[in-house]
Amino acid sequence: MVFCVDTSAWHHAARPEVARRWLAALSADQIGICDHVRLEILYSANSATDYDALADELDGLARIPVGAETFTRACQVQRELAHVAGLHHRSVKIADLVIAAAAELSGTIVWHYDENYDRVAAITGQPTEWIVPRGTL
């Protein structure tokens, strides 16, 4: 089992409520990221040195591919969200649609702390998992 980690999970990884499970998944090579998440994490770097250290850390994780079919699937899900409940498509960020599509197409589980993935999973039926129960962080 591989988790497609969302930025929300990454930023909570050091919290005591998350750390044990995160480290277990990391040591089992169960953590992967797509390039969208990589860009978001690297955006948060505070210096060039911090950027390079983060990039090195991210290089050790499994890469979840993002290609044209990922964007096609993200568009399909966005359309379904628009049709299920008027303007519901506007409640899910574009990045989250792409990350969810990458996870779905690669057969990985979105690991997150973000309710947007519940909305997407209601449409796709794909597996997602909160890093800790919703509302506990």
Swiss-Prot record:
<dbReference type="InterPro" id="IPR029060">
    <property type="entry name" value="PIN-like_dom_sf"/>
</dbReference>
<feature type="binding site">
    <location>
        <position position="6"/>
    </location>
    <ligand>
        <name>Mg(2+)</name>
    </ligand>
</feature>
<comment type="function">
    <text>Toxic component of a type II toxin-antitoxin (TA) system. An RNase. The cognate antitoxin is VapB18.</text>
</comment>
<dbReference type="InterPro" id="IPR050556">
    <property type="entry name" value="Type_II_TA_system_RNase"/>
</dbReference>
<feature type="domain" description="PINc">
    <location>
        <begin position="4"/>
        <end position="126"/>
    </location>
</feature>
<keyword id="KW-0479">Metal-binding</keyword>
<dbReference type="GO" id="GO:0004521">
    <property type="term" value="F:RNA endonuclease activity"/>
</dbReference>
<protein>
    <recommendedName>
        <fullName>Ribonuclease VapC18</fullName>
        <ecNumber>3.1.-.-</ecNumber>
    </recommendedName>
</protein>
<keyword id="KW-0378">Hydrolase</keyword>
<dbReference type="Pfam" id="PF01850">
    <property type="entry name" value="PIN"/>
</dbReference>
<dbReference type="InterPro" id="IPR022907">
    <property type="entry name" value="VapC_family"/>
</dbReference>
<keyword id="KW-1277">Toxin-antitoxin system</keyword>
<dbReference type="GO" id="GO:0000287">
    <property type="term" value="F:magnesium ion binding"/>
</dbReference>
<dbReference type="InterPro" id="IPR002716">
    <property type="entry name" value="PIN_dom"/>
</dbReference>
<feature type="binding site">
    <location>
        <position position="96"/>
    </location>
    <ligand>
        <name>Mg(2+)</name>
    </ligand>
</feature>
<comment type="similarity">
    <text>Belongs to the PINc/VapC protein family.</text>
</comment>
<keyword id="KW-0540">Nuclease</keyword>
<keyword id="KW-0460">Magnesium</keyword>
